[in-house]
């Protein structure tokens, strides 16, 4: 599924590709009798749509039992696309009994890429931290974070561990944009224009949609300044994942972007 923040048509750019990709692959699986297990890359986006929902969960934290029921084609459309795609996968799975489905639901994925420069939303976030766009302050936004190499490890384990079943929320730590910036400052100091404070929510609500169309007032109200809490115990107990250091993950990604000339010292 495309992971992009800037798009022209949510239905055509996000939702249709996510659904078509899932259905096409699983159609091929149904036609290939040797396949016994499918590992699907879904997302935390299929578990929760807005951070504020965390307070309404039974245990006060997101886990594999939760489904995103609040996103739509006009509110958090990327989250909506991932939810529709995973639900479609489970429906196709239920209609047959030859192969099993195991789902990986990663939170925000960071770490170095294999392909060099990237246009993914994750890279946009790190890029804006390092190129000065957030110098005046970072939005007060919390999220789960995981190293891309841990996500790869989770897929391999999900494929070969027999007891693996169902969904798996994959993240190491909960962090904020300012928290990521502070981790990077431990190595890079003030060499790059990393933010040193958070912007007030009221200011983002007032001017955010004017400055950046990806920030709707509804999105700001339901996510900024809210606590994100998740439960990753299933991934540790059932898949045996030993999560990497978030600090090392952020540094590896940031350094790769520096080496590629994506931003420069002040």
What are these regions (language model features)?
Residues 31, 70-102:
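Active-site Tyr-X1-5-Lys
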Residues 208-240:
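Conserved C-terminal active-site "lid" loop/helix of NAD(P)H-dependent oxidoreductases
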Residues 95-99, 111-125, 158-168:
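Glycine/proline-rich active-site loop of Rossmann-fold NAD(P)-dependent oxidoreductases
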Residues 43-74, 114, 131:
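Active-site "gating" loop of Rossmann-like NAD(P)-dependent oxidoreductase/epimerase domains
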């Amino acid at each position: 599924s495309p992971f992009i923040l800037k798009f022209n048509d949510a239905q055509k750019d996000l939702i249709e590709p996510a659904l078509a990709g899932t259905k096409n692959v699983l159609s091929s699986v149904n036609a290939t009798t040797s396949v016994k297990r499918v590992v699907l890359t879904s997302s935390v986006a299929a578990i929760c749509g807005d951070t504020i929902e965390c307070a309404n969960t039974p245990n006060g934290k997101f886990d594999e039992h939760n489904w995103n029921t609040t996103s739509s084609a006009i509110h958090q459309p990327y989250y909506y696309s991932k939810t529709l795609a995973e639900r479609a996968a489970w429906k196709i799975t239920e209609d047959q009994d030859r192969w099993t489905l195991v789902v990986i639901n990663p939170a925000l994925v960071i770490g170095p890429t294999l392909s060099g420069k990237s246009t993914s939303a994750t890279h946009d976030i790190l890029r804006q931290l390092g190129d000065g766009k957030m110098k005046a302050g970072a939005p007060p936004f919390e999220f789960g974070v995981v190293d891309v190499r841990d996500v790869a490890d989770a897929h391999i384990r999900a494929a070969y561990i027999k007891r693996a079943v169902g969904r798996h929320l994959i993240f190491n730590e909960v962090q904020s944009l300012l928290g990521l910036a502070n981790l990077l400052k431990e190595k890079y100091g003030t060499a790059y224009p990393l933010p040193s404070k958070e912007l007030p929510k009221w200011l983002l609500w007032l001017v955010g949609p004017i400055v950046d169309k990806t920030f709707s007032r509804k999105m700001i109200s339901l996510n900024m300044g809210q606590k994100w809490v998740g439960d990753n115990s299933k991934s540790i107990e059932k898949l045996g994942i030993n999560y990497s250091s978030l600090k090392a993950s952020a540094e590896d990604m940031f350094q790769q972007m520096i080496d590629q000339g994506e931003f420069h010292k002040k």
